[in-house]
Structure formats: structure tokens, C-alpha cells
Amino acid sequence: HADDLTRYGENFSSGGFNRLCREGVWFTNASLNYMQTTTPVSLATLSTGATPSIHGVVADRWFDYVGNKEVSLIEDRKEQSVNYSGGSGSYSPRNLVAQTLSDALAQQHPDSHIATIAVEPLSAIVMAGRSGEVYWMETLQSSWTTSSYYSKELPKWIADYNYQDQNEEYAIKRWTSLLPYD
């Protein structure tokens, strides 16, 4: 919810979200002339600020009548998973048409640190676009990974985290909210 930043603001450090709220632009009533359809279409709308007719994402898969084949939004046989041989990771943003906020930020401010972390690759890649660091959970290994499109190796901090097997430990724990819902 939009008001969650205000509601939970005292729990955040002075950097991060609180810095964005203090120094950034804050829209309290913004909307797009668009009806939510599927997750990849909605994520592309959020990450590009454009509607599907502009950003070109219609689903996570579609049929290309010209090429007479099914196309995946993120699957890309030219790429591989980094530090994992199970096949998951053959992904890239090559089928994304529009520039994302991350792409624009990288173009305007090349020294920016841009990272997207998600549970699965579709969300991570669609939100990031072509720029920055992109990581997702490789569920078969309970490890974080990325695509060779973004990096040839995992940064040391992620490799170290994966080596410690903390994800398996978290996977079996029951999640409970630290704060009350209301």
C-alpha cells in the first residue's frame, strides 16, 4: 500500500526509503489508465511508466505469428545461470522493448548502484530491464543466482551467503510479522 512508507517509516534507517521520501518526489494519488492483467504486464507498466501498448509486454509467453513460434519474455538460450548448472538462468531482458526506470537511471547517472532482488527471475528482470545487478532465488538449490547477461560471476557477498546455506534454514521457518498488521 502507498501509505506503508509513512506507516512503517520509523522502522527504516535514515537512508533508503526514508531518504527517498525526504529528498525524492512523492506522489500520493498517482494512476495509470490501464487495467491490471498479469504479473509481467503489470511489472513492466510499473518499471517503465508506460502502458502495454507502448512497453510491448503482453504476457510472460506469446505466439509470434511471423516467426511461427512461441516466445518467452525472459528466456534466452544465449545466456546461462551464474554458479548453477541446473538450467535455470538462461534469461535476459532482450525481449523487453521499453526502457525501465533502472535503465534511465543508469543512463543519466552511470555511477548509480542499481540492484533488483526477487524470489523469481521474471520479476527481477522485468523490474531491472537491461541495467544494474539482478538476482533471484534458484529454488532447486536454495541459492541466489543471476544470468550471465548481467554478470559472469556472483559478487563475493552473495557467494558467501549462498555458501552458508542460510536460505534452507529460512525456508523451513514459519514467517510471522514483526509488526501488527493494523
Where is each model-derived feature located?
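Active-site-proximal N-terminal segment of extracellular/periplasmic enzymes that hydrolyze or transfer
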Residues: H1-G24
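Short helix C-cap/helix-to-loop transition motifs enriched in small/turn-promoting residues
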Residues: S14, W26-T28, P52-G56
